[in-house]
């Protein structure tokens, strides 16, 4: 073949690549826009390669620059937290099309459509592929797995989160909470004002980290603490890097923080592999008398069964050491952040609404008596506190949105035709704040709406989805609620509290919902007569 032959072949190859690129970046987006336009669904126009990302970022940045104005009686935070959704909903309605690069995302807020996507027709949808930087942080465990492998891991891990198993962990969690309360009291008594200002968002990270470590590692708790301290450092680096996620190729640049992040990730993996090896050599028995089943033990036993013992009926590959490492990382990120954020917002809203703070405190005093530390049975009787936590989750859900991807062409609601590979954006916070579902006081803090239970709180059962819905519902929700109830009950019994003058109400999203400027709260001990954690063993009385 002469030079002209090679030139012709190269030209043909270049033309083929150009056609494929144009198909993905231009022709397909145009066809998708036309497809939804014929159904009466529009949105901001697709821009070549970048989609709507620039507009989304600009709207979010502008919203996050302005805190909520005091006094903080309204919780209408949706325009700040999901600024792009709030802005475009006013223009295009509650169902509209946006573009994450060349990928179409259809925003849906109708609870009946959401129920179909997450529950009735969940087999037609996958969790979308998250950004590699997010996967480094959250691990490639249960949250991001799909298909048979996800189902296998879910079945293996579920026993660790059964209520009877979690109750075995509560005494240890209670000791951690009491230790925190003792430190707060000592700090307040050391100040001549008799009060202390605490940024609860920082302290609750420590409390939830302890519970997560015990649930994940059980009798390997001390070794697990070392691993999760490294994971906390990695979270700090990754969270900062995530702010630059829209800079192409940023995660590959050998910056000082990226290099530190890579080293930490390697060290975490090395320590976890060593810990797993020790447990395997020791012969892990998940049924030790009086001990809770832990995530690590369940995974090791499942790996042993699939590699030489009982075989799974599912056509999945065996659980490997790397799978166990990823599940530990996932559980630390998802569990720690979800519970600490719930605790933070619960204390913030109770500080904003002293009338509900007093009602909850009176319930704790009536149910728990002088000790103020609820037993296993008493936790179930704290109905008002449960209502407050549900209302907190409604107004300030940990994840403000979730995304699913259509695995094939699908029709929803008998009228909405969705092409394959379209992503569906479910704006959880928008659904939680919808006055059509929750009434005219949807932006107000009113725990009484949950007095008849979650099912009767709104006009549709899928209107309240802080932990998701269906088979992929958060596996750790029972742990989060139990830990939050226990922690808030102890705080209510021992302290009165209010917002610090320095508090700025600025909910913002960095993967999960958190207070942009922290959560400084002023605590005043109620009396000096409550027992300290050295004087009592919590959660043993009935």
From Swiss-Prot:
Heme binds at residue 474. Induction: By brassinolide (BL). It is a single-pass membrane protein. The keyword Iron applies. Pfam families: p450 (PF00067). Keywords: Growth regulation, Heme, Iron, Membrane, Metal-binding, Monooxygenase, Oxidoreductase, Transmembrane, Transmembrane helix. Its main location: membrane. It is found in: Membrane. Highly expressed in leaf sheaths. Expressed in roots, shoot apex, leaf blades, internodes and panicles. It comes from the Eukaryota. The chain crosses the membrane at residues 2-22. InterPro entries: Cyt_P450, Cyt_P450_CS, Cyt_P450_E_grp-I, Cyt_P450_sf, Cytochrome_P450_Monooxygen. Cytochrome P450 involved in brassinosteroids (BRs) inactivation and regulation of BRs homeostasis. Is a multifunctional and multisubstrate enzyme that controls the endogenous bioactive BR content both by direct inactivation of castasterone (CS) and by decreasing the levels of BR precursors. Catalyzes the oxidation of carbon 22 hydroxylated BR intermediates to produce C26 oxidized metabolites. Plants overexpressing CYP734A6 show a dwarf phenotype, characterized by abnormal leaves with stiff, tortuous blades, undeveloped leaf sheaths, no flowering and bear seeds. Over-expression of CYP734A6 causes an important reduction of the levels of the BRs castasterone (CS), 6-deoxocastasterone (6-deoxoCS) and 6-deoxotyphasterol (6-deoxoTY). Belongs to the cytochrome P450 family. This is Cytochrome P450 734A6. The gene is CYP734A6.
């Amino acid at each position: 073949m002469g030079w002209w032959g090679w030139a012709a072949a190269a030209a043909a190859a270049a033309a083929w690549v150009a056609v494929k690129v144009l198909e993905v970046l231009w022709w397909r987006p145009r066809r998708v826009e036309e497809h939804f336009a014929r159904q009466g669904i529009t949105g901001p126009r697709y821009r070549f390669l970048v989609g709507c990302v620039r507009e989304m970022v600009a709207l979010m940045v502008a919203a996050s620059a302005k805190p909520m104005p005091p006094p903080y009686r309204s919780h209408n935070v949706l325009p700040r937290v999901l600024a792009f959704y709030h802005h475009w909903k006013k223009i295009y309605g509650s169902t509209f099309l946006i573009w994450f690069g060349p990928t179409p995302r259809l925003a849906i807020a109708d609870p009946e459509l959401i129920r179909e996507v997450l529950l009735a027709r969940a087999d037609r949808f996958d969790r979308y592929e998250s950004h590699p930087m997010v996967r480094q942080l959250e691990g490639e465990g249960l949250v991001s797995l799909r298909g048979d492998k996800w189902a296998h891991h879910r079945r293996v891990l579920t026993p660790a989160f059964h209520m009877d198993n979690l109750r075995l962990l509560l005494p240890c969690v209670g000791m951690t909470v009491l230790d925190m309360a003792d430190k707060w009291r000592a700090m307040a008594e050391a100040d001549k004002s008799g009060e202390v200002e605490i940024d609860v968002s920082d302290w609750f990270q420590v409390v939830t980290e302890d519970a997560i470590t015990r649930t994940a590692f059980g009798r390997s708790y001390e070794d697990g603490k070392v691993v999760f301290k490294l994971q906390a450092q990695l979270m700090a680096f990754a969270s900062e890097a995530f702010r630059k996620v829209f800079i192409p190729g940023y995660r590959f640049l050998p910056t000082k923080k990226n290099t530190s992040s890579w080293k930490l990730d390697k060290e975490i993996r090395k320590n976890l592999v060593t810990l797993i090896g020790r447990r395997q050599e020791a012969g892990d028995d998940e049924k030790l008398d009086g001990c809770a089943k832990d995530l690590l033990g369940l995974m090791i036993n499942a790996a042993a069964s699939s590699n030489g013992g009982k075989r799974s009926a599912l056509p999945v590959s065996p659980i490997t050491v790397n799978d166990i490492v990823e599940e530990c990382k996932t559980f630390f990120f998802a569990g720690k952040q979800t519970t600490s954020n719930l605790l933070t917002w619960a204390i913030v809203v109770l500080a904003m609404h002293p009338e509900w703070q007093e009602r909850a405190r009176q319930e704790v005093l009536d149910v728990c008596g002088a000790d103020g530390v609820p037993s296993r049975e008493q936790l179930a009787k704290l109905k008002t506190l449960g209502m407050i936590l549900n209302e907190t989750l409604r107004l300030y859900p940990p994840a403000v949105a979730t995304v699913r991807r259509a695995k094939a062409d699908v029709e929803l609601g008998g009228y909405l035709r969705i092409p394959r590979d379209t992503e569906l954006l479910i704006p959880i916070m928008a659904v939680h704040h919808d006055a059509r579902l929750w009434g005219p006081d949807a932006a107000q803090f009113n725990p009484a709406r949950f007095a008849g239970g979650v099912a009767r709180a709104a006009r549709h059962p899928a209107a309240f989805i802080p932990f998701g819905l269906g088979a992929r519902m958060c596996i750790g929700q029972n742990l989060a609620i139990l830990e939050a109830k226990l922690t808030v009950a102890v705080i209510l019994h021992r302290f009165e509290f209010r917002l610090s003058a320095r508090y700025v109400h600025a909910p913002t999203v960095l993967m999960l919902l958190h207070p942009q400027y922290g959560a400084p709260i002023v605590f005043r001990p109620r009396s000096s007569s409550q027992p300290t954690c050295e004087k009592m063993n919590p959660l043993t009385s009935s």
